[in-house]
Every structure is written in C-alpha cells, then in structure tokens.
C-alpha cells in the first residue's frame, strides 16, 4: 500500500461488539456466539464477524480522514466498497487502520465522474493485516441499476447432501428474504455503533438540502443486513465437515438511496465456483446479492466470496 497513513482509530473487539453487530445486522452465525464452537472447529477461539472489521474501516475513516468518505459534503456519496478478509479476528484483538490514496475504483460498474478512491488495511495488535480493501467516494451521478434478478423457488429436498462447493451453483440456497422496514433506530444505532457520524445519516436539515432530499441509511449497514439474510439461508443446509464455510471477501455498489420507512428485501443466489489452487480440497463460491426496495428498484448490489469443502478431484 503506497504512502499509507500511520495507524489510526484503535478499537478493541469485545463481546459487546459482536452482540451489537449481530443485533444490528441479523448475522447470528454460531461461530460468533457459541463460545465452544470455534475451539471445537480448530479456529483457536471465538471469532468476530469478518464484516465487523470491514465495516469499522469506514468508521475509522469517518473519524480520522473524513474527507475520504465525504463527511459533511452534501453532494458526495459512497459509491462502492471492496473488502478481503486475511485473518480471523478474535475477542480481545485490537484494531487500527492504515489508509492510502489510490486512483483505482473499489469495484467495477461505478458511474463515471470524479472520485476519491482509498485503500485501507485493518491491522491487529501483532501488526498482522486482518482485513484490506478499498472505498470509492463520488459526487457524480448514480449508475444505472440492473433489474431485480430472477430467483427461482428453492428447496434443499432433492439436493445432494451435504452440498459441496462444486454443487452450490446448481443446488445451493437462493431466495428472497422476508424483508425489513428501515427504522430510525436502525440508522442511528448503526451510525453510533460504527462511528459514522455523517450528517447524511443523522442531520435532517443537512440531508434535506442535500442531493437525496432526506436522511439515508448507511450503505455499509444495508449491505451487512443483506449479508445476514443470505447467510441464514446458506447455514440452513448441510455442508461438508472437511473445512468450514470461510468468508473470503465482499464488494458492493450503491445504486439508490434507502430512506427511513423504506422496506428492503434481499435477493441472493450462487453464481460461480472454482477450485482453490492452494487448497484443492476446497472451492471458492461466489454469491450475488441484491437489495430491492418496496418499489421494485435495486438499491444496492454486490458479491460475496466463500470458501467451502469441495468434492475430491
């Protein structure tokens, strides 16, 4: 990472952090909440959500480099985000953030226009990079949103259980969530928890005069909410006992604002598989995610990469 900053924004992962993240996003995966699960699976302890450290990168930038995320700019919005998880994060780990300017967009498919692109690394108390990625800020137009993807009816009946990585695209879970109406508590709770005091989220007078005409929900929160919806479906099926579903990384695009009172549904499906070159007994599966509002408009889309047990070659 060229010309990176000194570490900023020190924050220790606590039980309360994990509980609050789960409550705000609906990600109640056993590995984060069962104190016996991680040690029994050889994880070395109870691990935090990957997206806890990923999301916190935006909070740290908001606190220590606010121009990188447009804090206080009525015309700017976070257009895209990418994250890669390199190491497990445990209760008691101490995060800090290093960031640098770049001229590469965080993800593909962003609308043309002037951007502020930032790469980041989240570093633990041992100097190890646990999380890395990029965020793109823009004052340009919104990209054209795709149509909501078709998600066929799915049932695990008839699927070859356990479902290996090789079988995910054909047999893996896909669907549409029950939906969630965005509340005042969601927006304020996330902004305060993650350290994102953007007036676009919290200040009605500022937001009413801004580009979207009202306060919006933090896009990092809406993506985490969609991830929680998808993950519940994924973890409802049997997968191989060799290895476990490891979260490798994500990316997302902001396509339209989400307001308090909007109802959003998550659509998701597996879209690709490739065998791991370094661990041939494992495969990498990509899942597509869309968040769709009550008017049928896709407001955010993204990809999730997971590593899972594959069939022997």
Kindly give the residue locations of the regions a language model identified.
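HotDog/MaoC-like acyl-thioester-processing domains
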Residues: 1-7, 85, 89-172, 254-313
């Amino acid at each position: 990472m060229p010309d990176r900053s000194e570490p900023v924004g020190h924050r220790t992962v606590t039980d309360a952090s994990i509980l609050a993240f789960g409550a705000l996003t609906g990600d109640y995966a056993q590995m984060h909440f069962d104190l016996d699960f991680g040690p029994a699976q050889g994880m070395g302890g109870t691990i935090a959500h990957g997206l806890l450290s990923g999301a916190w990168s935006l909070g740290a930038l908001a606190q220590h480099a606010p121009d990188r995320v447009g804090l206080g700019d009525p015309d700017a919005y976070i257009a895209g985000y990418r994250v890669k998880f390199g190491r497990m994060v445990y209760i008691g780990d101490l995060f800090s953030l290093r960031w640098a300017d770049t001229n590469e967009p965080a993800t593909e498919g962003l609308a043309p226009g002037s951007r502020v692109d930032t790469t980041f690394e989240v570093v633990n108390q041992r100097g190890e990079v646990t999380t890395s990625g990029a965020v793109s800020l823009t004052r340009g137009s919104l990209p054209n949103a795709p149509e909501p993807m078709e998600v066929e009816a799915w049932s695990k009946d008839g699927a070859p259980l356990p479902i290996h990585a090789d079988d995910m695209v054909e047999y893996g879970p896909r669907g549409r969530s029950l939906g969630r109406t965005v509340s005042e508590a969601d927006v304020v709770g996330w902004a305060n928890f993650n350290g994102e005091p953007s007036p676009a989220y919290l200040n009605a007078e500022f937001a009413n005069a801004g580009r979207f005409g009202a306060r919006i929900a933090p896009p990092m929160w809406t993506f985490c909410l969609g991830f929680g919806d998808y993950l519940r479906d994924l973890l409802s099926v049997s997968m191989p006992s060799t290895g476990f579903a490891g979260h490798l990384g994500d990316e997302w695009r902001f396509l339209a604002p989400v307001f308090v009172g909007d109802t959003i549904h998550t659509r998701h499906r597996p879209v690709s598989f490739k065998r791991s070159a370094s661990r041939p007994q494992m495969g990498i599966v990509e899942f597509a995610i869309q968040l769709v509002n009550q008017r049928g408009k896709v407001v955010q889309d993204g990809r999730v990469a997971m590593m899972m047990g594959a069939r022997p070659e």
